[in-house]
């Protein structure tokens, strides 16, 4: 599969066609190989416009949904971000390009391992905490 072409098609047909107007955001997404975050058996879905189901009822949001979320955040370089339910890091990989501080909370040990691997391979640094939401109550 040609992931560069898939990424380009996703930007053109999903993001630009659906009110993602932040040029900086579009460029960041165009330059980042989202497929690198995905397990091998799911890489072919990395640019699809569907929710991808993972273990324990967890899921990966489509690129358009993630992009709308980040666009609405209007992040600045000195913002501090807390991401709960980081999954494999698809949203983290966008946010970390805007800010120097992101703390991530994830309850799935398997997703943490996938996330750590993709963070190190893509030269990201984030604080990652394994916990369950119940531990806060």
Where are these regions (language model features)?
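N-terminal auxiliary segments of SAM/dcSAM-dependent transferases
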Residues: 1-41
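Substrate-binding/active-site groove segments that recognize
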Residues: 48
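Conserved nucleotide-cofactor-binding alpha/beta core module
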Residues: 74-137
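Cytosolic histidine kinase catalytic core of two-component systems
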Residues: 23-24, 64, 110
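Conserved SAM-binding loop and adjacent beta-strand
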Residues: 20, 35-42, 52-70, 74-75
């Amino acid at each position: 599969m040609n992931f560069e072409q898939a990424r380009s098609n996703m930007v053109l047909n999903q993001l630009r066609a659906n009110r993602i107007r932040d040029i900086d955001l579009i460029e960041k997404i165009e330059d980042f190989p989202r497929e690198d975050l995905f397990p091998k058996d799911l890489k072919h879905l990395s640019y699809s416009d569907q929710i991808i189901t993972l273990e324990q009822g967890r899921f990966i949001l489509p690129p358009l949904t993630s992009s709308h979320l980040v666009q609405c955040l209007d992040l600045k370089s000195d913002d501090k971000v807390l991401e709960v339910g980081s999954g494999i890091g698809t949203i983290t990989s966008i946010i970390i390009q805007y800010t120097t501080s992101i703390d991530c909370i994830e309850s799935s040990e398997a997703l943490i391992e996938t996330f750590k691997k993709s963070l190190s391979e893509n030269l990201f640094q984030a604080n990652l905490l394994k916990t369950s939401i119940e531990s806060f109550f």
